[in-house]
């Protein structure tokens, strides 16, 4: 079992089937990482479990049925969101062909009908009004907005997974730091930076 009963309650993953698929997903990462460099070679089993907890914690902040995970890499958090939210459409975007190949295998192996894969850069992808953007801290929030602001709209909300509060200095945008429930489990600083248009 991936999580004890207390952690299951905090993370909202009491369904045995979902837990099994999450476990299968982690095993696929470990297997493919030997040849594909999906995550750092130094990543331990405990590190992967912590990544999983971080990604599961974002579920509490999701209030839409369309999610866009940019720079998804090995599928964190997109695959985790898709596995635990079967009614939510999750688009996973990455410019690395090898990582998209891995995600294609994961989608088929775990029968993820609500996951859609896109081999492209965020600069070349137009975000729909309904999509919530999620991402790990690939870059600073300021660099991220500079990169994607031509492709988003006033309704776009971004949730960036971070370990500390960060400010944004681009005119027209605001941020809100949200504490993650993962802090209770990991005993480490964890949170989300909510980035949105000032009008939103």
Give the positions of each predicted feature:
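Conserved beta-strand/loop positions that form the S-adenosyl-L-methionine
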Residues: 70-72
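Conserved SAM-binding loop of SAM-dependent methyltransferases across substrates and taxa
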Residues: 74-87
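Class I SAM-dependent transferase core
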Residues: 1-64, 68, 98-99, 105-115
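S-adenosylmethionine
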Residues: 88-91, 95-200
């Amino acid at each position: 079992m991936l999580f004890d009963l207390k952690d299951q309650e905090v993370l909202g993953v009491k369904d045995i089937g979902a837990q099994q698929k999450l476990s299968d997903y982690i095993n696929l990462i470990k297997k493919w990482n030997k040849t594909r460099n999906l995550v750092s070679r130094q990543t331990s089993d405990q590190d992967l479990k912590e990544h999983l907890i971080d990604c599961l914690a974002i579920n509490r902040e999701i209030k839409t049925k369309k999610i866009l995970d940019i720079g998804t890499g090995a599928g964190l958090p997109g695959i985790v969101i898709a596995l635990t939210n079967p009614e939510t459409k999750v688009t996973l975007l990455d410019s690395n062909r090898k990582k998209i190949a891995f995600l294609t295998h994961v989608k088929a192996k775990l029968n993820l009908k609500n996951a859609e894969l896109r081999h492209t850069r965020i600069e070349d992808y137009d975000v729909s009004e309904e999509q919530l953007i999620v991402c790990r801290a690939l870059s600073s929030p300021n660099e991220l907005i500079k990169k994607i602001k031509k492709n988003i709209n006033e309704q776009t909300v971004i949730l960036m997974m971070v370990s500390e509060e960060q400010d944004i200095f681009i005119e027209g945008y605001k941020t809100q730091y949200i504490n993650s429930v993962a802090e209770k489990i990991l005993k480490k600083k964890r949170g989300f930076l909510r980035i949105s248009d000032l009008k939103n």
